[in-house]
């Protein structure tokens, strides 16, 4: 039973904690927060042992009546691996100041830069490369979504180049500080955006084949991607078939009422998903088209949750718990109730 410490019980951390708890071969030994808020209180209510992420802040939790077990240095020795879910940029400091110092394996999230880790993880593409490694980055929600779709396409034809426009949500639903409220913002205003090179850290052979551009729009529910992928030749039916055969990606039909990110989120609610999480990538079947060997399709990405199962598989890879990535994917999917 792998002992997992979650450093940062926020949007990603609380989801990773719940996902770890669902597995038969791993357990959460503790979660951390930097300050006492409702999430810290909820962690304790859910039965997680709570630790301060910052040494010396334990009294702040005690003053708020939140049961605190100590700080991260009181628990880290017991961990086999740490899943770092701190805000972007903090993970780099934690690698140097905590994980390397205590000789602990750690997974950081996509907000960290690739040069600070040994490799970038995706369950389909880089499980074998990350096997037994010490410091790995689980790539961002957008990169995860693109990697899954490109895997499906690559399984049925050779990819010559990919062009992707990312329509990004302005903020997460719980974030009242970000925006925009009444604007469409090129982010970044330069092309390419960082998303293409990030895909290249997972799939080195695509490094010079993918170019991305990104904009932010006033919505909170999901991102959207519009892909244009030039190939050596395929058909619409072959692409759809490849999508249906690839784990954690599936087709949805606008004709059936799933015609927007709003209705997709409603679908996630209706099937009983916690926090309406959609761990899979939905691709609109009607959007799939092939013109002169170029594939066109549109997909949605639930930014709060699609990376969660990847973190679970990454734990197994780094701790050498399972050699076969497909077996790990199947274990994770079954435990979490992922559609396929």
UniProtKB/Swiss-Prot annotation:
Q: What UniProt keywords are attached to this protein's entry?
A: Cytoplasm, Glycolysis, NAD, NADP, Oxidoreductase
Give compartment(s): Cytoplasm
Instruction: List the pathway annotation.
Output: Carbohydrate degradation; glycolysis; pyruvate from D-glyceraldehyde 3-phosphate: step 1/5
Q: Which organism is it from?
A: Methanococcus aeolicus (strain ATCC BAA-1280 / DSM 17508 / OCM 812 / Nankai-3)
How does this polypeptide assemble, per the annotation?
Answer: Homotetramer.
Tell me a Gene Ontology molecular-function term this record carries: glyceraldehyde-3-phosphate dehydrogenase (NADP+) (phosphorylating) activity
Q: Name one Pfam family in it.
A: Gp_dh_C
Catalytic activity annotation: D-glyceraldehyde 3-phosphate + phosphate + NADP(+) = (2R)-3-phospho-glyceroyl phosphate + NADPH + H(+); D-glyceraldehyde 3-phosphate + phosphate + NAD(+) = (2R)-3-phospho-glyceroyl phosphate + NADH + H(+)
The protein, known as: Glyceraldehyde-3-phosphate dehydrogenase
The answer, when asked if Manganese is one of the entry's keywords, is no
Its ancestry begins with: Archaea, Methanobacteriati, Methanobacteriota, Methanomada group, Methanococci
